[in-house]
Structure formats: C-alpha cells, structure tokens
Design a protein with these regions (language model features):
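N-terminal flexible segment immediately upstream of the FAD-binding catalytic core
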Residues: 11-13
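Short polybasic amphipathic segments
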Residues: 4-9
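Active-site nucleotide/adenylate-binding loops and adjacent lid/helix of ATP-dependent enzymes
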Residues: 15-142
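Flexible, glycine/charged-enriched surface loops at secondary-structure junctions
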Residues: 1
Length: 142
C-alpha cells in the first residue's frame, strides 16, 4: 500500500517489511543500511566492488575529488533511502556545483562517487535468502 509496509507470507512464517527492513532485521543492520558511507566502507572491506569516491565536507573537497575520480560523478546524501537527493551523471564542474548547492539545502553530509553506468537492482533478503528482486527504473516520459 501507500504506507510502504508489506507482508510476505502468512502466520508464523510471515514477514512484515518496510522498504528494506523486516521485522527480523537487527538494530545494527538498520543503522548500517541507513548510512551509505559506512555501508560503502563495509562492502569494500569485504572485497565487494563499490564506486570510487568519498565523503566531502566543502566545495573545495568536492571539486578536488571530482577531478581525482573523473567525470561523470554522482552526489548523494550520506543518510537516506529510496534514491532521495541522489544526483546522477553530473558531467562537468558547472553541473556538479549546481547539484551540490541544491543538495546542501537538504543535508551537509554528502558523498561523491564515480558514476557507473548500469542497472539499479533492489534485492530483498530474508533469513539469508533472496526472496525478491526488482529493477529500479527512473521515471520518464515517452
């Protein structure tokens, strides 16, 4: 429904899920999943590929990092979900500064990463098993 809360299964085998969090998700998992930078670090430590980039604290750091990793880039809030505030495929300094200025109105905790072209999949795992997967498609007009 509109609340974003779903039930998978029934009775004692059933699970309640909101976004990516189920009634079986522990607090540490929730905290990690809400922090994109921490999630990125933990994935990297486990040798799971992540986009090159880091947290930035000001526009000078932002521009230096963009120059280092190369355009196009992505900027996004460190905390959040559902793609809110994520600005993709910024191709030059002008686009980056405009996006950064806009994002600063929402948060000062900002991550910049190399833009990697490809598909965006959302995977739902319950009890260490994949129970659902979806391809996320950005809204568009035909």
């Amino acid at each position: 429904g509109k609340s974003g809360i779903y039930q998978i299964g029934y009775g004692k085998q059933g699970r309640i899920i909101e976004a990516a969090i189920s009634n079986k998700t522990n607090c540490v998992g929730v905290d990690i999943s809400c922090d994109k930078f921490l999630t990125k670090q933990l994935l990297d430590i486990q040798n799971i590929p992540v986009a090159e980039g880091r947290k930035v604290f000001n526009i000078i750091g932002l521009l230096r990092e963009a120059e280092f990793i190369g355009y196009p880039v992505v900027i996004k809030p460190q905390y959040g979900n559902k793609g809110k505030g994520v600005m993709l495929n910024l191709k030059n300094e002008k686009e980056l500064i405009k996006a950064y200025t806009s994002l600063l109105k929402i948060t000062k905790d900002i991550i910049i990463e190399k833009y990697v072209k490809g598909n965006d999949y959302r995977i739902c795992v319950v009890d260490y098993k994949v129970v659902a997967a979806s391809l996320r498609v950005v809204p568009f007009v035909i």
